[in-house]
Amino acid sequence: VAGRAGRRESEGVVIIQTSEPDNPVIGWVARGDYEAMVRCELADRHAFSYPPYSRLFQLTMRCEDLTLLRQGALFLADAMRAKFGRRVAGPVAPPIDKIRGQYIVRIMLKIENGRSMARARELLREALAQFGAEKEFKTINIAIDVDAQ
C-alpha cells in the first residue's frame, strides 16, 4: 500500500502497525533507509545460509491419512538427515495443513552456494528411493520445489 501513497499532488500517509515498534526494520522503513535494511537482511541470510547464499528444496508431502503422513515424513526427514545433516528442516505442517481432503507437511533442504547441486540431487534421489521402497508409504504424494519462495 505504501507504493500507492503520494502519487498525486499531495503527499500520502503510510501507517505502520506492528507489535514490535523497536524492530530495526520498522525504523529503516519509516526513514526510507532501504539500503540499511537490505544490508542487514543480507547479513542475516548469509549467517543462516538462506538465499541468495544457498538453494532451497521444499518437499511438500500430501496424504489423506494424517498418521501415515506423519510417519512417512519422519522417515523421509531421517533419511535426508543421514545424508545432509543439519541442512534438513522439518517436517512441519504449513498454516493451512489440509486441502481437498489431504493433509500436508513440508521438509526443507538448504544447499549452500559452492556445493555441488548434482551431488545434492543424487543424495536426495537416494533418500527418496529409500522412502519409495517402503510400501506402506505408497499413498503419500511428494512434490519438490527447488528455489522455493
For each of these PLM feature ranges, what is it?
Residues 3-149:
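Accessory helical-bundle/CTD segments and flexible terminal tails appended to RecA-like ATPase motors
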